[in-house]
Amino acid sequence: MISPEILRRYPFFGFMTDAELKAVAMIAEEVSYKEGETLLESEKPANSLFFLVEGSVDHLYVVNDHNHTKTRKEFHIDEFAPGDIVGISALIEPYRYTATVRAHTPTCAIKIAGDALRALCEVDTALAYRLMRETAKAAMERLHSTRILLAAARAT
């Protein structure tokens, strides 16, 4: 459990009431990762949602050749910094991560249990709607950023 005041610092949670913040804080914890440690891995079950507090992480797109188990390539997409959200797949079916996120520097994050957050949404549909609205905004921002990076890569 963390203090609801920690969540209040993030615009993503700006819509939440005190009671909602308290409920989410109950299913959250602060976690730390050393440089090079993996926060979440592509194709694995999306069990958690993360908000970066300190440090930076690399957002990697992973290509696996399922016919040849030794063939795996990682492509660096972007780097995330404090305030960014990662692991939104924990809120979107089929609840599997679509990328790998690895600590670029020593990193501290708020980790929220995905199953518990989804359970809160099942009970409170208004919370679910507002949470999904914020999740959609985060996904759209990520898509926009990726398009810019792709355009820049093609321009060179």
Language-model segments: what does each one mean?
Residues 1-156:
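Cytosolic regulatory regions built on CNB/CRP/Popeye-like sensor folds
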